[in-house]
Every structure is written in C-alpha cells, then in structure tokens.
Amino acid sequence: MKIVNSIKDLKAYLAEAKQDNKKIGFVPTMGALHNGHLSLVQHCVKNNDVCVVSVFVNPTQFNDKHDLETYPRTLEADCVLLESAGCDYVFAPSVEEMYPEPDTRTFDLGTVSEVMEGAKRPGHFNGVAQVVSKLFYIVEPDNAYFGEKDFQQIAVIRAMVKQLNIPVTINACPIVREGDGLALSSRNTRLTPEQRQKAPLIARTLKESTTFVPGKSVQEVIDYVVNTINSDPVMEVEYYEIVDGNTLESIKNWSDTDYPVGCITVYCGEVRLIDNIKY
C-alpha cells in the first residue's frame, strides 16, 4: 500500500493502472476510520482492480469552526486499518494541496441539497460537492463507495455527478451498526459512557416505528419517533422527516411514494448523531 500526499504522484500511479485497463474503485473519507468505512473499502476491493481511499478533513463542508477543530484525526491508525483491508493507495493531501486557491464554485442541486441537513447546516453540501468533485477529477474512478448512514449526502453526490457529467458509478452501501444498533460514526468516540449507553435508543425507535406502517399515518409515526427519543433527557431530536428516498421531498401519506425513508438527526448531549430507516 502506498501513502500519497500529492495529486501529481497519485495521478502518475493511477495512469499506469488505467493504461492496463484496470478498474479503479474509490472511497472518499475524512479519516477517523471505523468498521463502517472498512466495509466500504471491502466492497471497493472486491469489485475493482485498484482501491484508492482518500483521508482528508475537508474544511469547506464544516459550518461550525469548533466541529472542524475537534474532528478526530488519526491518520497513522487509519493507514494500519486500510492496509489490512486491502487498500492500494491512501491519498492524504494537505488543505493547500486540495485548495491551492479558494474554491468559489456554488452548486445548485435542488431539493436534495436544500432540505434536512441542507437547511440545518448552510453551505455544508456545497462544500461536500466541491471536495468530492475535485477528488473525482483527481482519481477518475470507475466506482465510488458511500455509506447509507449519510443518506442525503448520497443523493447530493448523485445529483452533482449527473450535473457535471462525471463518468463514475455511485455505489451506496448498507449502514454498519454496533451490536446494540447504534450506527457507526466517527463522532461516537465523543460520547460519554452514559450517552453511549443511551444512543441506541435512536435505532431502536426507528426500527419499532416500521411496525406501525401502514396502520398509522406518516405524521403519527413521526410524532412517535420524536416523542419517544425526546423522552430521554440526554437526547434531543433536531429533525425527523419521512421523505421520498429519491427526491428527498417530505411525504404526507404513505401512498405518496413507493420508497419512503425516515431521516433523523439527534443531539445526544453535544454530539450530533444521524441515522435513517427504510419503511
């Protein structure tokens, strides 16, 4: 496995692979890797000849400076995990390498980038589109892999790829969970022991809520999820929306879509956790 810091070097390595008609798979990450990321890497290794993983904490997608500063950075440990998972190239550029000058591009990706996370974190998805488009131009992968925990992010990236005509297949991989149901996230390490004990309530409540469909209305299911989670004093639901899984538009009735997905964000103490479930 090679660890590469410069765009020029990575492009040189990958040019050889492309000349040999090798299929290139790519997993973009911000590091602080866990088994969720590693499952993406395993999908990538299995279905491609070359596996590239980027580790880059992208400043343009953080709308909270404190969040950027406290985001865990564990490159050495990440590389050990990536090597054992069969990764070929780790691309770990500096901010200066990725942004030699400010990226002033703004993306208009419609509803998928405006609702839920888009409304709560202004500029977040624009930053995601900036960095992922740059990474796609650098790596030129055949396949890219993203985790369904960030359900909305996948919709944003699909819209961006379509708009920019980037020839890459976006692969969405299932959420990986702890034994008690909590969706794996780099932010979980910031939970106190008490918060960590309480956090599985999110996944448990979402799962329970699927048993009410179609008997209860969409609004009744939303109320149940929000009230159940908020009944724990450590937890506060920021939003819970049931949307069409393709357009991300909120639905009022189950008949509005054949692909209803519930997307939730919960503050567990200071830590912001996200999850989703298909109905």
Swiss-Prot record:
InterPro entries for this protein: Pantoate_ligase, Pantoate_ligase_C, Rossmann-like_a/b/a_fold
GO CC field: cytosol
One annotated GO biological process: pantothenate biosynthetic process
Annotated beta-alanine binding sites: 61
Catalytic activity annotation: (R)-pantoate + beta-alanine + ATP = (R)-pantothenate + AMP + diphosphate + H(+)
Enzyme Commission number, as recorded: 6.3.2.1
Any coiled-coil regions, as ranges: none
Active site: 37
GO molecular function: ATP binding; pantoate-beta-alanine ligase activity
Residues annotated to bind (R)-pantoate: 61, 153
Keywords, alphabetical: ATP-binding, Cytoplasm, Ligase, Nucleotide-binding, Pantothenate biosynthesis
Keyword Cytoplasm applies: yes
Subcellular location: Cytoplasm
Signal peptide per UniProt: none
Residues where ATP binds: 30-37, 147-150, 176, 184-187
Broadest EC class assigned to this enzyme: ligase
Pathway given in the UniProt record: Cofactor biosynthesis; (R)-pantothenate biosynthesis; (R)-pantothenate from (R)-pantoate and beta-alanine: step 1/1
Function: Catalyzes the condensation of pantoate with beta-alanine in an ATP-dependent reaction via a pantoyl-adenylate intermediate.
Miscellaneous field: The reaction proceeds by a bi uni uni bi ping pong mechanism.
Subunit structure: Homodimer.
Family, per entry: Belongs to the pantothenate synthetase family.
Stated name of the protein: Pantothenate synthetase
Species: Parabacteroides distasonis (strain ATCC 8503 / DSM 20701 / CIP 104284 / JCM 5825 / NCTC 11152)
